[in-house]
Amino acid sequence: LEALIAHEVTKRYSHHLALDRVSLAIPAQTIFGLLGPNGAGKTTLIRIINQIIQADEGTITLFGERLQEKHIGTIGYLPEERGLYKKMRVGDQLIYFAQLKGLSRQEAVARSKAWVTKFEIKDWWNKKVEDLSKGMAQKVQFISTVMHEPRLIILDEPFSGFDPINAQLITKEILELKEKGCTIIFSTHRMETVEDLCDHIALIDKSKKILEGSKRQVKETYRTHTYTVEHRGAFDLDAAKYRLIQQRVVEDDFYKSVIAVNDNSGPNQLLRDLIPVTEVHSFIEKIPTMSEIFITLVKGGHHE
């Protein structure tokens, strides 16, 4: 089941095509990475989903229904440009945002108190937002995004301003929300976060979607069939089958080699060919990182 389907969504501004027939299918209860360089169109798509702006063409379906005003309460949105009221106290702010999303005052107070206890920030309840550090304000904004228990959560660069400890806390919360049944759209340039958290990804570049799929499928598509081998003793391999990209001495007679497979031999055949000629200590496929795939596609200008 898809939580959200975007079909040929297009958005034009006077001198700029911000989205060019972008289609996406976001599976329910997954963490979906919406990736792309600055200015690619990610934020435009997020604003359309949040009904802040409207698409010129195309449709968006949310949990099986065409997107409409009533869905605002089922979405939690953490924008990249954070929007807390500087003069307002933390507790009042959380209660206010929760009520905006349809909670009763009593429920808003109860949930706000539960969340500040969970995040160990009860001492901040009566502090004004302007007195908080950037990281503290981030926590408050995150709570206000998820407190009304939305089915779809959209996080735009959620880790900017967080130190590693708080980033870990937010990561844990995101994974818990997914376990509880939430679908999370994660817009970021931080590829290491994508590597750790996302199940599915889409890459938008120059207003078009250029890649979409599960993380495993994407990595499978961009496999380089290259292997790193640590071994004792130098060797030569059949040049028709293998290309020795690198072989360096680590110490004494101990080497680290990088080998590309030229034909369809695969890892088992490579290992069989290595065993008679060297003493293999470790053997691992070099799987491209999401960062490497991102750079290859964006710099290479590859489009579907």
Enumerate the language-model features and the residues they cover.
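Residues that scaffold the ATP/ADP-binding catalytic core of kinase and kinase-like folds
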Residues: K70, T221, I293
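ABC transporter nucleotide-binding domains
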Residues: L4, K11-D205, L211
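ABC-family P-loop ATPase nucleotide-binding domain
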Residues: L1-T10, G300-E304
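Short, charged/small-residue-rich alpha-helical element at the C-terminal edge
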Residues: T226-G300, E304
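Alpha-helix N-cap/helix-start and coil->helix boundary motif
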Residues: T10, Q68, G91, M191, ...
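ABC transporter nucleotide-binding domain
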Residues: T171-A260
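Generic structural marker for isolated residues within well-ordered, non-membrane alpha-helices
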Residues: L94, S112, K215, L271, ...
